Amino acid sequence: TVARTVQVSYKIDKNTIIEVTRFTDIDGQNVTLNRSVKEDGTGELVYTKAQKTKKSKLTNQSYDVFLKLATSKSMPQTRGATVGSDVTGSQYKHIFVSNLSYTIDNTAIAQIEIGGVETAASLLITGLHLPGSTAVTVGSFLVSVVLATSPSKVVINQSLYEVHFAYDNSYYTHCYHDILYSYDSGGHLMDTTKSVSYTHLRAHETLMN
């Protein structure tokens, strides 16, 4: 699957966070998403697929989130029986950060049908400010929903939490709860998809229900 191919790296260059996300799209093409985030939340997304490069200006990116991702000592976990429960036990506490809502309209859906996960992830990075691995994972779900239901629009409601170690309140990971609502042209709800993503986990370990 697309999510299993995701590789993400971070570095800090003069207070600018550089995030590089690489993955293989559903059409077999290799994709690179190169995002920069400055302290004021502005930045740029440069995405390359099939030797074609596009650029988008970014605003309202959470510098704090990306700084923690770039400096966190949390290592990606291997999949096991405790994935999911390992960050919901009493040794961790979830701290609410924000709610966001983003609408994928009919024009964007048509672009996703052509561009695949690369287009979906780029839209989510711009609209919901998701970290690369989470954007690719949720983007994969979005592409699946679009191809399966051919919706007129998709509304994504997102809740963001920080997860801290309970014993010393130190940062562990970010937790993204995303719900995708698909509607037909008459405004009728067609499908609901939920995902829970932890930034310390590899994208393919995102939890679905």
Task: Enumerate the predicted regions with their spans.
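Short hydrophobic membrane-inserting alpha-helices and related fusion/pore-forming segments
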Residues: 119-141
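Residue-level signal for glycine
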Residues: 186-187
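Acidic, proline/serine/threonine- and glycine-rich low-complexity intrinsically disordered segments
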Residues: 195-197
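N-terminal propeptides/leader regions of secreted preproproteins
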Residues: 1-98
